[in-house]
Amino acid sequence: MKIVLKIGGAALENKDLVGQFCTTVASLAKDGHHVLVVHGGGAALSRTLKELGIEPKFLNGLRVTDARTRDVALMVLGGLLNKQLAAAIGAVGQPAIGLCGSDLHLCVARKKPLAEDLGFVGEIASVNEEAIAHLWANNAVPVVASLAQGADGEFYNINADEMASALAAACIADTLIFLTDVPGVKDANGDVLNRLGLDRIESLIANGIVSGGMLPKLEACKRALQAGVGSVRILPATKAEALPSLFESPIAFGTELVATV
């Protein structure tokens, strides 16, 4: 199976969870699955910005990324966090290579059109599927930081959920899994929804039932499913050790999203 895993910045702050996640990635790869990891790192980025005397700025929940913030993101996400995560996967016996979107021409970004200009905030314009296939053929797990270069030569900060969705869509992954700090997608009563089809996803978005960070995540899920990804799962990061069992039985926690129910 082709599996794309996205681990959020909050989970990366927990060393025990990261260790658990890396062991799971190694186990999946050793079982013959092709695994690709995408990560963000917003918490570490904000912390480093403050240490450098740069106050993080947000507009409607989205990070304002001026040139200085973008450069620090390259250092923190594309450097420290990326290499630490790739090394941690390697430490449990699975070869992994740390990349950002510009490495191996993995993907090309473009400035994201938004009502308010947020600076160097981008979206994925194209993906080099052959580069991913080459790494998988050589038994390597790509670990991708959510940054990519545009045709204009500028680096752009990419929403990690959107990057994971774009990469999963490009390689037509069997499953895309988001490991988050929430138990799953909730309905209007606050109860976790176990399984959703595209029609229900669109209804939740249209009726304003989902908000905050879950909104772009569901939009990313929708695009992945529409592009042919087999299924998407939104799971609490604390359940990382149970990932292998998800391919053997129905999902027991979190939310599974499919094209049709």
Swiss-Prot record:
Pathway: Amino-acid biosynthesis; L-arginine biosynthesis; N(2)-acetyl-L-ornithine from L-glutamate: step 2/4. It comes from the Bacteria. The keyword Cytoplasm applies. One of its GO terms (molecular function) is acetylglutamate kinase activity. The record marks K6, K217 as: Transition state stabilizer. Its EC number is 2.7.2.8. Keywords: Amino-acid biosynthesis, Arginine biosynthesis, ATP-binding, Cytoplasm, Kinase, Nucleotide-binding, Transferase. Substrate binds at G41, G42, R63, N157. GO terms for biological process: arginine biosynthetic process via ornithine; L-arginine biosynthetic process. It catalyses: N-acetyl-L-glutamate + ATP = N-acetyl-L-glutamyl 5-phosphate + ADP. It is found in: Cytoplasm. Its main location: cytoplasm. InterPro entries: AceGlu_kinase-like_sf, AcgluKinase_fam, ArgB, Asp/Glu/Uridylate_kinase, Glu/AcGlu_kinase. GO terms for cellular component: cytoplasm. Belongs to the acetylglutamate kinase family. ArgB subfamily. Catalyzes the ATP-dependent phosphorylation of N-acetyl-L-glutamate. HAMAP family: ArgB. This is Acetylglutamate kinase. The lineage of its organism: Bacteria, Pseudomonadati, Acidobacteriota, Terriglobia, Terriglobales.
